[in-house]
């Protein structure tokens, strides 16, 4: 297969990439312009976790109804599933460049709709548009970069797409933090995404189509012009010859260079094996929990005992920064270490770090501060009803208080030490303000814990190990392993599998104790559509 997976030489591919800055900036321009699609992908993944905290404050219907919160998050994922599935076919039919232009247009429209939404319904419509754009871009960006990159540094350049995904997540947390005090908070958070979409649209208008797609469609001369800009003079003729032989072999084998369908795809042994590997990697990437961690890292931080929204967002910014750093590590090692070895190291580290998180959350939930009758009675007429009527109220601790649901209750810490017994009170904004006025901390998601810093270490380890391997390799492999003729369609199938897996492990709206069990590895809730009897989510502290 032309442009197959390249075996690294003694020269670091990372250094080769850096040298392109002065030797051939055209290649970097192609890679980073297409990689903005990854930036959009990452930004959307990260921004909603912080924006949702403030959307709930503006739209009380969202705060009261778990189903609306679920819809705001998951409709973008549903849109991405459709976008990735349709995008695969469109890539082979219309070309990589046109699909990226369409993705940018959809994302821009979605960002404008969300930023101006007067209610939850239109906000969800905007999320669907954004999802369609993200789905198309998520599989097209690495494909375009792969087909417009010299073989020996292809892995490193496709890893720049991974870097821009994680960079987008980091940017989203930074913007979330920047707008926490601004009027319109969440509208700025979701609206800012329109600018990189517009920038990529303009840049892609000025860039050529993928040379390999052009050659496959019979536009050999146009493809050769682009390849001569990408490859050094002593390599370009061999690359053109390899591409020619690859296309001719496919045409000879299948009898036509244009006709293509799923049956032919599945009858081709190389494609079946590639799909097994490509889809498996994409599914497994989601099942190790990365998007759960990124979507809900502010919530996870609060579960570890950090009460403030702003503190949670700030600590999540550190997490996103580590994710971006891990992508840089991937760029350096992907072509010199190899895909398989990087995956093994990554998965080993992920397992260890999830073990750390499991232990921390187990300790947090089983050793939370007790509820004191003295502290609770300090606040008149706002005691949690379930606590007042409980026969075993002396055994109540903070976690028991947070699980009360008739109505929702919160934990107001001791003014001297948050680990000492505190008060169990009705959860609403008025009570929260009363708690804060006495220099106490207000908890509605997690409880005070002396182990909170270990949760941060566990999160950091998880991201550091995940990002260079499981974060980047699935996208790189899916841009390389398929025959040129099936590359767009197969890449779309694999990306669709990724987004479907993302939706399956979606946890928004699950009760606190179920999220804890998931993080502890005790339960994995595949049936996200079965809500059962769930209490409404509680407002988070600020």
Where are these regions (language model features)?
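Alpha-helical transmembrane bundle of multi-pass membrane proteins
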Residues: 1-231, 250-542
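Short intracellular "coupling" helices and adjacent cytoplasmic loop segments at the cytosolic face
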Residues: 229-239, 245, 252
């Amino acid at each position: 297969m032309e442009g197959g997976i390249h075996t690294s030489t003694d020269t670091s591919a990372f250094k080769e990439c850096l040298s392109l800055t002065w030797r051939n900036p055209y290649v970097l321009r192609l890679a980073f312009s297409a990689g903005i699609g990854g930036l959009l992908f990452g930004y959307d993944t990260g921004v909603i976790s912080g924006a949702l905290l403030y959307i709930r404050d503006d739209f009380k219907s969202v705060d009261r109804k778990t189903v609306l919160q679920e819809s705001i998050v998951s409709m973008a994922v549903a849109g991405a599933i459709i976008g990735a599935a349709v995008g695969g076919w469109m890539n082979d039919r219309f070309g990589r460049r046109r699909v990226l232009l369409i993705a940018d247009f959809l994302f821009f429209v979605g960002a404008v709709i969300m930023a101006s939404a007067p209610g939850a319904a239109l906000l969800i419509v905007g999320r669907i548009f954004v999802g369609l754009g993200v789905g198309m871009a998520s599989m097209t960006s690495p494909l375009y970069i792969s087909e417009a990159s010299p073989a020996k540094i292809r892995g490193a350049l496709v890893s720049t797409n991974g870097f821009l995904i994680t960079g987008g997540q980091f940017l989203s947390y930074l913007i979330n933090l920047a707008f926490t005090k601004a009027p319109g908070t969440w509208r700025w958070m979701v609206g800012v995404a329109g600018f990189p979409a517009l920038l990529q649209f303009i840049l892609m208008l000025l860039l050529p189509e993928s040379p390999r797609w052009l050659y496959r469609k019979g536009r050999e001369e146009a493809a050769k012009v682009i390849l001569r800009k990408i490859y050094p003079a002593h390599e370009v003729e061999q690359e053109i010859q390899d591409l020619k032989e690859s296309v001719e072999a496919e045409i000879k084998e299948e009898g036509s260079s244009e006709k293509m369908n799923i049956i032919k795809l599945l009858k081709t042994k190389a494609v079946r094996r590639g799909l097994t590997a490509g889809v498996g990697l994409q599914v497994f990437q989601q099942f190790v929990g990365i998007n759960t961690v990124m979507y809900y890292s502010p919530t996870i931080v609060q579960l570890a005992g950090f009460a403030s929204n702003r503190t949670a967002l700030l600590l999540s910014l550190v997490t996103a920064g580590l994710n971006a750093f891990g992508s840089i590590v991937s760029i350096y090692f992907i072509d010199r270490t190899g895909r398989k070895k990087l995956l093994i190291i990554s998965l080993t580290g992920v397992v260890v770090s999830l073990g750390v998180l499991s232990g921390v959350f187990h300790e947090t939930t089983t050793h939370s501060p007790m509820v004191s009758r003295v502290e609770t009675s300090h606040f008149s007429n706002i005691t949690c009803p379930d606590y007042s009527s409980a026969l075993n109220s002396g055994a109540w601790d903070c976690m028991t208080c947070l699980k009360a649901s008739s109505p929702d209750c919160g934990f107001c810490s001791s003014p001297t030490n948050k680990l000492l017994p505190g008060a169990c009170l009705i959860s609403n904004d008025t009570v929260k303000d009363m708690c804060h006025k006495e220099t106490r901390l207000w908890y509605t998601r997690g409880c005070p814990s002396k182990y909170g810093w270990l949760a941060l270490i566990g999160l950091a380890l998880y991201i550091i190990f995940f990002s260079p391997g499981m974060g980047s390799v699935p996208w790189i492999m899916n841009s390389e392993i398929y025959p040129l003729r099936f590359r767009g369609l197969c890449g779309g199938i694999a990306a669709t599998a990724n987004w479907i897996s993302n939706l399956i492990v979606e946890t928004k709206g699950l009760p606190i104790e179920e999220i804890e069990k998931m993080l502890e590895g005790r339960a994995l809730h595949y049936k996200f559509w079965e809500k059962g009897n769930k209490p409404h989510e509680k407002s988070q502290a600020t």
